């Protein structure tokens, strides 16, 4: 029932919007069951752990095996201490064959905004997170 509902709603929306963002849990249920239409861009998001990057790599490989091949697939690494990936994580990104779209630094202000119910779009213009996200959007050409 839920899968059919998601599929129906996405189909209704796709003719009205230039972009549709579908946030999946760490898995491929919506893709493997054919619920979502073909997408142009698949953005995999991981924390900065090696295991998280490995999971993103497995999802990218599964997408390929299911013949679900977006025009572009990339990785965003989120909540990175000081905004700097360590050598082990960078090595794992290379090992997984993932394109790094960007790194979003850890920021306590994002946590506080969430606690206060404020959208992160209201972060100050000089916020490192806002700057990182704007860079990723620019890199994607959105």
Each PLM stretch: what is its role?
Residues 106:
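Active-site donor-binding loop signature of nucleotide-sugar glycosyltransferases
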Residues 116-127:
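C-terminal boundary of histidine-terminating zinc-finger modules
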Residues 86, 126-129, 133:
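Generic structural signal for well-ordered, non-membrane alpha-helical segments
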Residues 1-103, 112:
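Conserved catalytic-core segment of NTP-binding enzymes
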Residues 132-142:
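C-terminal alpha-helix
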């Amino acid at each position: 029932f839920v899968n059919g509902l998601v599929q129906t709603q996405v189909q209704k929306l796709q003719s009205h919007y230039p972009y549709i963002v579908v946030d999946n849990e760490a898995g491929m249920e919506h893709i493997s069951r054919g619920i979502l239409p073909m997408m142009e861009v698949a953005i995999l998001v991981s924390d900065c752990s090696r295991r998280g990057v490995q999971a993103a790599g497995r999802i990218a490989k599964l997408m390929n095996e299911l013949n679900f091949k977006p025009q572009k697939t990339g990785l965003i690494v989120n909540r990175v201490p000081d905004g700097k990936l360590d050598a082990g994580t960078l090595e794992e990104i290379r090992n997984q064959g993932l394109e790094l779209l960007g790194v979003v630094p850890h920021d306590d202000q994002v946590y506080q905004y969430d606690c206060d119910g404020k959208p992160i779009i209201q972060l100050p213009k000089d916020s490192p997170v806002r700057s990182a996200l704007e860079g990723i959007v620019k890199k994607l050409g959105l």
